[in-house]
A protein has these predicted regions:
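Residue(s) in the substrate-gating loop at a strand-loop-helix junction
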Residues: 143
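Alpha-helical segment proximal to the catalytic Tyr-Lys
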Residues: 127, 172-176, 235
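Substrate-binding pocket helix/loop in short-chain dehydrogenase/reductase
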Residues: 98-99, 106-111, 207
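Short C-terminal tail/terminal secondary-structure segment
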Residues: 148, 213, 227, 238-251
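Active-site helix of classical SDR
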Residues: 122, 159, 167
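Short, small/polar-rich loop/turn modules that mediate ligand/substrate recognition or access, typified
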Residues: 88, 175, 180, 237-239
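Conserved glycine-rich cofactor-binding loop
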Residues: 15-17, 39
Length: 251
């Protein structure tokens, strides 16, 4: 894979899990990484690790649901690196509750972080990419729950399904400008969110019964898929949805 030297990518939810692994991997390929999250100590820790390894990173605190935070991230990113080449809309919020147990504020939180945050990332990321006029790549992190339903996932399915189609709409609209928009749909992954999903279940039994490859994904495997989509290796891909679930949705 060609390196990403002199390119700059914004990665939301970059303080832990998939976002942290993607930040480290993309930086290791020569890119400037702007990683954002709400938890400052997590973001600074990832930034420090990247810098200590001799790569380029800048942490900016951000709530992806706040429009002014997006303006600030773009402004600081352009001031620091001079250009933006892509955005990875990874920040997420999840609620594993039945409809009866869900409150409206629970539903809104999941929709706001996952769907509204992704919309704002698409909107402001596109504006920044346009400034250099050479196209770019926006990656939406959806979920297998953006493609199929499951019990106690009402808000998550609604939000992640919206992210999936937001990516397709963005691909249609932005293709003429060589701005590509694709979505990734992870299955069960070794993150805090993944652990919460299987809480109360026999995880080993769930995995063996539902995932043909017989294990969960690790965050690094999802990060490699993100790297592929932000790189020129995927230059003719837009509007695509890459499912990385070990065969969970193949049954």
């Amino acid at each position: 894979m060609k390196n990403l030297k002199n390119k700059t990518f914004i990665i939301t939810g970059g303080g832990r899990g998939i976002g942290a692994e993607a930040s480290k991997l993309i930086a290791s390929k020569g890119a400037n990484v702007i990683l954002t999250c709400r938890t400052e100590n997590q973001g600074l820790s990832v930034e420090k690790e990247i810098l200590n390894n001799g790569y380029c990173a800048k942490f900016i605190p951000q709530d992806v649901t706040i429009e002014n935070d997006w303006r600030n991230v773009i402004e600081e990113g352009l001031a620091t690196y001079g250009r933006i080449d892509g955005v990875v809309n990874n920040a997420g919020s999840f609620s594993w509750k039945s409809m009866n147990d869900s409150k409206l504020e629970d539903f809104r939180e999941v929709i706001d972080v996952n769907l509204t945050g992704s919309f704002l990332g698409l909107k402001y990321g596109t504006e920044a990419i346009r400034k250099h006029g050479k196209g770019g790549s926006i990656v939406m992190i959806s979920s297998v729950l953006g493609k199929v339903g499951a019990s106690n996932t009402t808000a998550v399915c609604a939000a992640k399904g919206g992210v999936r189609l937001l990516a397709k709409a963005g691909a249609c609209e932005l293709g003429p400008e060589k701005i590509r928009v694709n979505s990734i749909h992870p299955g069960l992954t070794d993150t805090e969110i993944g652990k919460a999903f299987t809480q109360g279940l026999n995880e080993d039994e769930f995995v063996q019964s539902n995932i043909p490859l017989g294990r969960k994904a690790n965050s690094g495997e999802i990060a490699k898929t993100i790297l592929f989509l932000v790189s020129d290796e995927s230059f003719f891909m837009t509007g695509a949805e890459l499912t990385v679930d070990g065969g969970l949705t193949a049954r």
